[in-house]
Regions:
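Acidic/histidine-enriched segments that form metal/cofactor-coordinating
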Residues: 44, 120-230, 383-402
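Short acidic/His-enriched helical or mixed secondary-structure segments at domain edges of catalytic enzymes
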Residues: 178-197, 275-293, 330-334, 376-426, ...
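Buried hydrophobic packing residues in well-ordered domains
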Residues: 66, 84, 101-104, 124, ...
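C-terminal regions of mature proteins
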Residues: 39-51, 241-246, 353, 384-469
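Bacterial N-terminal signal peptides
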Residues: 20-33
């Protein structure tokens, strides 16, 4: 599960530096000029909205033969981040061809018609340019990172890799072997194995059940011809999204895109809503492993980014995370790293994670903290503190062009449109204690637990009793 430790911020959703500066300046002016608290609140809200508008105005949206393009201008930036995103994610694949999109993108970044593998590596190394790929349940991407000075040449290589990959046998086998080795190692590491087991339980009957990364068996079965066919059916502008962040001119960029990606066929791909997850009862699956501690994770359904509930849910998850750390680690020393987490998927999840020798006592405490969050009054100062910390992490994480490109893509593909990425802060500031309690009651229930460890040491009743009962 993505970002389960919550020691990381949620998947690349941040504002630009200019946004941060504008808010800080507006707040300072407000505090200095308005003596009344109510007036300060009104001015702060107005300043934030103005900052949102200013940041959104840096984004230019345009269409090239059905390809949607988002360009975020960052004047003076010395780097450029580019992502060619493929819509669909797990919905593009089946049990039989899971992993083909990941392998296709990986092999494409190895060699292309005009840049065989050795030449591509030499050129990229000379410029310090990076081309890579990424896949998740909702979309995948071919990614480019370069300096502004080397963007022109880097763009040539990137577009050639995207549009004219050679898929030579030796290149495909190289990427294949790396992927297979990684997939076969999944069961060696308890944390990784825990995620694989959790996915089988949580996503049964759902499109997410077919992992975009595939399995060792499926990845090993693909041939270069399979990749060529999949590439041909995927490279349609209706299936793609291009996001670029850097100090670039939109007019010049349009010409470059028209002469490259703009020549692709449109196709007729139409995104469909993702089926939401539904857990009707708490469950527990225990896998025997001779380990010094038990590895435990539990999932509950969570609101998607398009839901108004996502904002109080972020606060609720953060409060729970902090309370678990205090109660489980600091006060009782039951575990080194208890955590609560919240995802950013179209069919979203949240959950608990812990490693503990005394699994039963640890889970009593953790489920007790969920119950407390659901039923005891929450201090408004706690909510404000969490939001303030979130803002700090938010802005720090927004410092790179790659993070901003990822944020725009996430909200465009999963969050109801890229403009919503600029409204997160104000939505969070509007969260009240009652909202936090409400979403905790609504979503933090029917938890599906997976445990790796000693089945004899696990009290099933503790894990499957509903929080709050």
């Amino acid at each position: 599960m993505q970002n389960r430790r919550n020691t990381k911020t949620q998947m690349n959703r941040f504002y630009s530096n200019i946004h941060s500066i504008l808010i800080a300046v507006c707040l300072l002016l407000t505090a200095c000029s308005l003596p009344a608290f109510a007036q300060q609140g009104q001015a702060t809200a107005a300043a934030a909205k103005s900052a949102e508008a200013a940041s959104a105005a840096l984004v230019t949206e345009f269409d090239v033969n059905g390809l949607k393009v988002l360009l975020k201008k960052r004047a003076g930036s010395q780097t450029v981040a580019t992502g060619l995103f493929i819509r669909g994610g797990a919905r593009n694949i089946t049990k039989e061809n899971a992993g083909i999109e990941s392998l296709m993108l990986g092999a494409a970044s190895e060699a292309s018609a005009n840049f065989p593998r050795e030449r591509m590596r030499a050129e990229l190394a000379r410029m310090g340019t990076q081309i890579g790929s990424s896949v998740n349940y909702d979309y995948s991407a071919l990614l480019l990172g370069s300096t502004r000075a080397n963007f022109d040449r880097s763009w040539e290589i990137f577009t050639d890799a995207a549009l004219r990959p050679t898929f030579k046998t030796e290149d495909v086998q190289l990427v294949q072997s790396r992927m297979i080795s990684s997939l076969r190692d999944d069961t060696d590491d308890p944390d990784t194995y825990l995620q694989r087991l959790q996915e089988r339980v949580a996503y049964a009957g759902h499109p997410y059940f077919n992992r975009p990364q595939g399995t060792a068996e499926t990845v090993a079965s693909f041939t270069p011809e399979d990749l060529r066919k999949y590439h041909q059916q995927t490279m349609q502008t209706s299936r793609l999204l291009l996001v670029i962040v850097g100090d670039l001119d939109a007019a010049q960029l349009k010409e470059r895109i028209a002469s490259t990606f703009g020549k692709l066929p449109r196709g007729d791909y139409k995104p469909q809503p993702v089926q939401q997850l539904s857990f009707s009862a708490p469950t527990l699956e225990v896998t025997q492993r001779g380990l010094p501690t038990n590895y435990i994770q539990g999932l509950f359904t969570a609101p998607p980014l398009t839901s108004d509930d996502i904002y109080p849910m972020r606060v609720a998850s953060a409060i729970l995370r902090d309370r678990l750390f205090e109660e489980v680690r600091v006060k009782r020393n039951l575990s080194y790293a208890p955590s609560a987490f919240l995802g950013s998927q179209a069919a979203n999840i949240g959950g608990l994670y812990v490693t503990a020798v005394d699994a039963n006592q640890t889970m009593r405490v953790m489920l007790g903290e969920i119950s407390r969050l659901q039923h005891e009054q929450i201090d408004d100062d706690d909510v404000k503190s969490i939001v303030s910390q979130y803002l700090t992490d938010y802005y720090l994480g927004q410092e790179t062009n790659a993070a901003q490109a990822g944020d725009l893509a996430l909200y465009e593909l999963v969050g109801g449109g890229w403009r919503n990425s600029f409204e997160v802060i104000e939505h969070l500031k509007a969260v009240k204690p009652a909202d936090v309690q409400r979403v905790a009651q609504k979503y933090m229930r029917n938890i599906r637990f997976v445990v790796i460890g000693d089945p004899k040491s696990i009290d099933r009743n503790i894990f499957t009793t509903q929080a709050g009962e």
